[in-house]
């Protein structure tokens, strides 16, 4: 049994532990998107960040852009019965692993949104050309009042259309910096460990909020994430990619403790899955 198959088995077990299968929780199985009421528009003048558990976020800008990042919206931590977005302007993928691609194809088909990611991954998804934007670190794009940049990440990336298919190389992983007009600059790190290039991200883009993995094992844990906060010089951090599987043991409390050791005053913002944070 390869690691991908093992993780899929862990997902099934985790779903049962959280009260049944994904379908029983009111969220669709991977590749399926429930038809639900559209989410409310962003509060006037605010950027709204909704965490769907794991590394999945939906971001609404003051100018009306609605952007999903790594939309595994049926993950075991996903909010029960929450309305999935009916309208999206863009879907951003950090890499090809199933727990990040999630329902990207189904959401793209449903909403008509363009899907952005590494060139190889986008080719593997097989979406219509008009919705496929393959790029790489250094690429810059604009959607309404949001300018976003693909940046480096330190991880691996492969993609399989389903658990029974062999995984294929899906290009280099990336993170995203989102510069929001009349709003904050956000950094979604994707899956990564800390790296010196985070200092360049701080210098070039000056993000104020970082969405960082803290679970460990496949990404950085709390101690490494605290070092990333130091390199990025952000004022706030929203932890992600923790608690979804038993292997992801890092916690927000541990991150807070590690930041205190560094005498770093960045605020740790810990939303519940499904909760929206206004920035």
UniProtKB/Swiss-Prot annotation:
One GO molecular function term? Answer: hydrolase activity
Pfam families xrefs? Lactamase_B_2
- Kindly state which keywords UniProt assigns to this record, in alphabetical order: Hydrolase
Query: Which segments cross the bilayer?
Result: none
Q: Which domain of life is it from?
A: Bacteria
Reply yes or no: does the keyword Hydrolase apply. yes
Q: Mind telling me which SMART domains this protein's record contains? A: Lactamase_B
The record's listing under InterPro entries reads: Metallo-B-lactamas, RibonucZ/Hydroxyglut_hydro, UPF0173, UPF0173_UPF0282_UlaG_hydrolase
Q: Does the keyword Secreted apply?
A: no
**Into which family does the record put it?**
Belongs to the UPF0173 family.
Q: How is this protein named in the record?
A: UPF0173 metal-dependent hydrolase MXAN_1394
Q: Which organism is it from?
A: Myxococcus xanthus (strain DK1622)
Lineage runs: Bacteria, Pseudomonadati, Myxococcota, Myxococcia, Myxococcales
């Amino acid at each position: 049994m390869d690691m991908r198959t093992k993780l899929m088995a862990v997902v099934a077990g985790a779903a049962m532990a959280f009260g049944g299968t994904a379908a029983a929780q009111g969220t669709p199985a991977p590749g399926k998107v429930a038809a639900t009421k559209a989410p409310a528009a962003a509060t006037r003048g605010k950027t709204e960040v909704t965490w769907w558990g794991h590394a999945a976020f939906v971001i609404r800008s003051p100018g009306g852009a609605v952007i999903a990042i790594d939309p595994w919206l049926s993950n075991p931590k996903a909010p029960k019965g929450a309305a999935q977005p009916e309208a999206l302007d863009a879907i951003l993928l950090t890499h090809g692993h199933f727990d990040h691609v999630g329902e990207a194809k189904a959401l793209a088909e449903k909403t008509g949104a363009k899907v952005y990611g590494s060139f190889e991954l986008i080719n593997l998804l097989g979406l219509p050309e008009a919705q496929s934007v393959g790029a790489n670190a250094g690429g810059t794009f604009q959607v309404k009042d949001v300018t976003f940049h693909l940046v480096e990440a330190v991880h691996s990336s492969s993609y399989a259309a389903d658990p029974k298919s062999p995984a294929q190389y899906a290009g280099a992983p990336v993170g995203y910096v989102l510069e929001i007009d009349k709003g904050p600059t956000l950094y979604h790190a994707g899956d990564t460990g800390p790296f010196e290039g985070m200092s360049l991200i701080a210098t070039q883009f000056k993000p104020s909020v970082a969405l960082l993995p803290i679970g460990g094992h496949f990404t950085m844990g709390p101690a490494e994430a605290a070092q990333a906060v130091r390199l990025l010089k952000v004022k706030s951090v929203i932890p992600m990619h923790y608690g979804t599987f038993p292997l992801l043991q890092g916690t927000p409390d541990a991150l807070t403790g590690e930041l205190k050791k560094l005498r770093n005053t960045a605020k740790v913002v810990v939303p519940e899955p499904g909760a929206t944070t206004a920035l």
